[in-house]
């Protein structure tokens, strides 16, 4: 895995999710100072092939019944806040500069110019700086690695600010398999389907307490 906290090979991840009955996965590796080291910490755009490598490896095991979609989990310099970006494509990412430099407003405007969605991930973890809700589309109101009390606060914050909601597994090890996600009435085959369904909120949240 690209993210330092990942512990499972991409091929095994796809197999585990297929066995669990999922019809797809969004690969959101950490795009953060912890992922890029040395020279690439300042110029991560020079190592986008490295950053996208897990996605392309998992893509090899995509089938008619199982989709592998690209996303990202972005963190700015000097903050612990993480942002899940849905809809983003590897080809577009290769054309960008260092996305850890722009602050939340500029990132929001940049992503919206392409039709992507920005969700704040696990916003009530102790070290997280919650963003200005004007600069996100949604909130991860359930995170598979986060205590219920913190997830409940995330739900209330999203509801108060009229934000889209999503559930995520935050998969790092085998123990996290299937802890979060969404159940939809139709299979999500690509990022266009994903964006449309996230905007509609026509799905059921997976929550595993």
Regions found by a protein language model. Give the residues of each.
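A metal-dependent hydrolase metal-coordination microenvironment
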Residues: 1-105, 134, 138-166, 174-176, ...
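Active-site-proximal loop/helix segments of hydrolase catalytic cores
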Residues: 7, 114, 119-131, 146-149
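Short, charged beta->alpha transition segments
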Residues: 71-72, 104-107, 121-129
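Short, hydrophobic beta-strand segments that form beta-sheet elements in well-ordered domains
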Residues: 50, 117-123, 165-167
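C-terminal functional module detector
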Residues: 24-27, 88, 126, 174-209
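Short, conserved, surface-exposed binding loops centered on an aromatic residue
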Residues: 75-77, 108-113, 128-132
């Amino acid at each position: 895995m690209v993210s330092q906290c990942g512990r499972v090979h991409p091929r095994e991840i796809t197999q585990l999710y297929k066995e669990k009955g999922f019809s797809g996965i969004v690969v959101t590796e950490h795009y953060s100072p912890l992922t890029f080291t040395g020279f690439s910490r300042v110029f991560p755009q020079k190592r986008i092939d490295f950053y996208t490598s897990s996605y392309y490896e998992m893509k090899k095991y995509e089938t008619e019944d199982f989709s592998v979609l690209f996303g990202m989990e972005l963190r700015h310099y000097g903050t612990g806040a993480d942002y899940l970006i849905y809809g983003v494509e590897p080809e577009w990412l290769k054309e960008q500069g260092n996305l850890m430099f722009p602050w939340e407003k500029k990132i929001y405007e940049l992503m919206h110019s392409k039709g992507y969605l920005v969700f704040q991930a696990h916003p009530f973890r102790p070290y997280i700086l919650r963003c200005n809700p004007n600069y996100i589309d949604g909130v991860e109101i359930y995170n598979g690695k986060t205590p219920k009390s913190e997830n409940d606060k995330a739900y209330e914050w999203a509801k108060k600010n009229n934000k889209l909601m999503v559930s995520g597994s935050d998969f790092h090890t085998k123990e996290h398999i299937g802890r979060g996600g969404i159940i939809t009435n139709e299979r999500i085959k690509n990022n266009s389907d994903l964006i449309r369904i996230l905007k509609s909120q026509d799905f059921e949240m997976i929550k595993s307490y």
